[in-house]
Structure formats: C-alpha cells, structure tokens
Amino acid sequence: MFNLNEGVLASIFTEAKHWAQMPWYAVVPAIIAICVVAYLLGSVNSAIIISKVFYGEDVRTKGSGNAGTTNMLRNYGGLAAVGTLVGDMLKTAISIAIAGVVFGFGYAGPISVSEMCYVAGLFSIIGHVFPAYYGFKGGKGVLSTATMVLILSPIVFLILIVLFIGIVWFSRYVSLGSVVAASLFPVVLHGYFAVFSVQMPGLMALSSILLAILIVWCHRSNLVRIGNRTENKLSFGKKKKPESDEE
C-alpha cells in the first residue's frame, strides 16, 4: 500500500517482503557505494560525448560554453539536443532506480527508500555539475533536478513547473525562473508532507536543501547580470541569442 513517507517510486520498490532489520552502521557501505555510483553516472555528460564523437568538437568551446541541451540545439541541431536531453534524464533516473532496488528489495533498515532515492539523485546532479571525467566543468543541473523531482515527487514537480512558467512568462528571465523554483523546492516539498500531517524524512529534507543551494550557486553569474539588467530576456516573438543556458 502507498506510504507518503516512501513516495511513488518507493512504493513500487517496497512490494517485496522485507527479510531483515539492519542497524544504521550496517547500511553505511551501501550508502557510500550508491553515492559514488550516482556521482560517476552523473559525471557522464551526453552533450560533451555527442559533440566530440559526432562533431569532433567540445560543446564547451561553442556558444555559451555550457554542456547542456540548449547549447547543443543552438550549435548542432535538434537531433543532438534530443540525444543530450535523453542522456541527461536517463542517468538521473538510473541512479535513482539503483538506490530504489538496493534499498527496496529485502531491506528494512533505519533509512527509507525515498531518502536514499533523493540522496542518489543529489549525487547524480553533483556529478552533472562537477563531472569527474571532464575537469569538473559540467552543466547547471536544472534538467537533472527536474527529472529527479518528476520521478520522486510528481505533485511537487507540477507545482514548481507552474511557478517556473509563471516567473519566466512575466519576467522573461529563464534563469530567474530556475533559481526561484529551485529555492522553493524544499519549501514546497515540506508543505506537501505537512498537508498530510506527515513528517518529512531527514535525508530527504537535507537533499532538497542542498539541491536548492547548488542550483542557486550555479546561477550566481546570471543573478549578477539580472541585477545589472544585462541578462538576456527570453523573446517569444523574435529569435534572440541568450547568454546562458539552464541545463
């Protein structure tokens, strides 16, 4: 049966019967392993791979210099952008699924499945932003974060995407929409649990806060430009080359 503390994905993984109660210290190696695997998966950057393999270039030397979907679209076209989009979403989903399998089937310890799914998602996004394979220079983590929230908390995702669209529509700043949505992620997630009078698991709360801080930090230059009124605005009527990307 669905448990709010476990979430949608976790409710699928916990259908199997738990076979043991494990103390927290016995779970530490599994937690560390999942964090490392998620980080290494997140470090695989589809934009860099596609641009190098198929175009003989590093996308980070083109356009805005961001290794993300928008910059791929601008420089290499729709097919390259779709490949990047799918790759970035898959690595986040796979990281979460691994945590769900390890902590869902045959496990009944002090950490919930959803908590570990959030932790895995966090480390995958850290890998995307600071990829070990590419000199720790990656994307901004917006798409990866959106993928994680969509998988683990679809209702929270819907609320945040409405806020994002509203802010972008009225301000024309995509970066501002990303920052505000990310900043409100921990608040909306906490509110979601509060509506059902359920306490949010600690690691889930911590992961959401760290993600919000990370996304805001990644957009620090955008915020400076917004303050100086030099940040490019999104144009719905005519094509205008933006100065930065959001992936």
Show the residue positions of the predicted features.
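Transmembrane alpha-helix interface/packing and boundary motifs in multi-pass membrane proteins
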Residues: 37-43, 48, 83, 125-135, ...
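Hydrophobic residues within alpha-helical transmembrane segments
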Residues: 86-90, 163, 180-184
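Short, strongly hydrophobic alpha-helical membrane anchors
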Residues: 1-27
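Short, non-helical or kinked segments that cap or interrupt transmembrane helices
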Residues: 57-69, 133-146, 173-182
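Loop-to-transmembrane alpha-helix initiation sites
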Residues: 158-160, 174-182, 199-208
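Cytosolic, membrane-interface loops and tails of multi-pass inner-membrane proteins
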Residues: 48-79, 138, 224-247
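Interfacial segments of multi-pass membrane proteins
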Residues: 73-78, 99-103, 123, 141-171, ...
